[in-house]
Amino acid sequence: MPNAAAAQRRHLIPFAAVSASYFAHIGFFNPYLPLWLKELGFGLVAISILTSVQAATRLFAPYGWGWLSDHTGERVKLLRYGATMALVCACILFFDLGPLGLGLVLLVMFTHTSSMMPMSEAAMAHLVSQGGAFDAKRYGRVRLCGSLGFLVTVFLAGAWFEHFGMKHFPGWTVLSLAAVTASVWWLPDLKEAVPTQEIKLSVGPVLKQQPVLWFFITAFFHVLSHIGVYVFFSLYLDALGYSKVWIGMLWAVSVIVEIIWFFTQAKWMPKLPLTAWLVVCSAAMTLRMGVTAQWADVLWVLLLAQALHALTFAANHTVCIALLSHHFPGRLRGRGQALYTVIAYGFPGVLGGLLGGLMSDRWGLQSVYWVSMCTAAIATAAAYKVWRLQHPKQKAAGLA
């Protein structure tokens, strides 16, 4: 057993590198892409459309990649292909592209990067669930590396862009995706067995289960509430007069509390059933968006709102991955992760990005956060429904 545990740890180290490099890429790309597009001369509506391309690819790419990975067992080889193609696309950002050309490059790049976390999470969930139960402690340690990567680049990029301007954004993109590609090629070439009797397993019967259906409704509205942060937060702070350094620092606060949560979550998670955590996380999101809408110009209040990210993202993410691993085991795991990406990030990303752009253009960026507060309240109600449906079953299933 000690040898098996040591082998599992060795296998998880490359996954930690993938998590660190991928979220290092996200740490500068997502916060500063809108500001780069703004410097290129695009208006709010055009920026919202271009930033929504990433979410649009999550409507089809994750499930396609998930289907391939489930039916071939070759998650690692597919990850390597996706990372390499994304790096090639990033090199094209150096050229002077019009809105259509830029949109096309982003479409191809995001089609390949959008597959990376679902497949990586599925492969990692397989490793940390081999004892029969989801190991939140080991998962948290690996995911913590991603948060550290995000933290480093959001700090460095903010200072860099403040001093040198946004013209170096394509260079940062290429360097970060080169790191992702290198780390993906370091992954052990583990192929999951594909038993012929399991190939025809369908996700349909799982989706018809009431707790699963309400779980996805919760995930949809919870992440829809986050779009105000993912797409418009940097623009909102910029409009309020915050410098790029302070924008980076405010992003960093959310990542620091995220790191603390991932490092200590094994201590806190057993205190409540997983579905009860869903309720807590969405309720915290309702509070966070309301505070951001009303008091974003008060620094210390905004800092406290950002600190709620420990619950609204970190805790929520771990709970969702654990529930997915429970409801979509074995050969269903890749498609379960992909469905989560499509429903929780694809549709909300497209709707939130496009509607948020229209709202902010008409009523100002603050309006996005008031609407986000309302969608978070809907997520809270849906999470409560999940808890009511599943709570009696959780202790027996090892999910309490």
Model-flagged regions — what are they?
Residues A5-A55, V212-L250:
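Helix-loop boundary and gating motifs at the non-cytosolic
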Residues A20, C89, P99-M117, F220, ...:
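Hydrophobic core of transmembrane alpha-helices in multi-pass small-molecule transporters
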Residues L107-C145:
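Cytoplasmic helix-loop-helix junction between adjacent transmembrane helices
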